[in-house]
Regions:
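Short intrinsically disordered terminal tails
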Residues: 1-2, 52-56
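A short, exposed loop/beta-hairpin motif centered on an aromatic-Gly-Thr core
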Residues: 32-47, 53
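Generic detector of intrinsically disordered, low-complexity, polar/charged segments
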Residues: 11-12, 22, 32, 39, ...
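Short N-terminal "domain-start" leader segments
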Residues: 1-28
Length: 56
């Protein structure tokens, strides 16, 4: 299976959100900060995850 392709990235507050396109299926999002990542199926949830990850 081919890894998902990163089709966009938004940097914010010391973290980032990437939009990923799998070989088959729907887009999903990866929110990362401070060495931790969370995955979600919608951008709104990805934004909430990033807010949680960047808190000190």
């Amino acid at each position: 299976m081919k890894p998902s392709e990163v089709i966009s990235r938004t940097d914010r507050d010391g973290g980032f959100i990437e939009t990923l396109q799998p070989e088959r299926g729907e887009l999903f999002y990866r929110s990362c900060a401070h060495g931790y990542c969370r995955y979600s199926s919608d951008l709104w949830q990805a934004e909430l995850y990033l807010d949680q990850l960047v808190k000190p």
